[in-house]
Amino acid sequence: MAKKSKIAKAKKQMAMIEKYADKRQELKAAGDRTALAKLPRDSNPNRLRLRDQTDGRPRGYMRKFGMSRIKFRELAHQGLIPGVKKASW
């Protein structure tokens, strides 16, 4: 389980990214680098670290499922993820 402060920071960053997304897109299209630099740092989506939705784990994140490899394995073994089954060959 990640620290609660880190999870809260990630949520705050997501809100800021959504808030400035349109403005950032317009400035990028216009090529106005100085105005882009004046936007808040956390409004840049490259600074966001994707985290597990259930426990906030930052590493081993699987984008397709929105969770870490550990949670994915637990839920897959329980059969709670549709379309996922254990491979055997």
Curated annotation (Swiss-Prot):
InterPro entries: Ribosomal_uS14, Ribosomal_uS14_bac/plastid, Ribosomal_uS14_sf. Residues 49-58 have a biased composition (Basic and acidic residues). One of its GO terms (biological process) is translation. It comes from the Bacteria. The keyword rRNA-binding applies. Keywords: Ribonucleoprotein, Ribosomal protein, RNA-binding, rRNA-binding. Gene3D superfamilies: 30s Ribosomal Protein S14, Chain N. It holds the Pfam family Ribosomal_S14. SUPFAM superfamilies: Glucocorticoid receptor-like (DNA-binding domain) (SSF57716). Residues 29-62 are annotated as: Disordered. GO terms for molecular function: rRNA binding; structural constituent of ribosome. GO terms for cellular component: cytoplasm; small ribosomal subunit. The keyword Ubl conjugation does not apply. NCBIfam families: PRK08881.1. Binds 16S rRNA, required for the assembly of 30S particles and may also be responsible for determining the conformation of the 16S rRNA at the A site. Part of the 30S ribosomal subunit. Contacts proteins S3 and S10. Belongs to the universal ribosomal protein uS14 family. This is Small ribosomal subunit protein uS14A. It comes from Enterococcus faecalis (strain ATCC 700802 / V583). The gene is rpsN1.
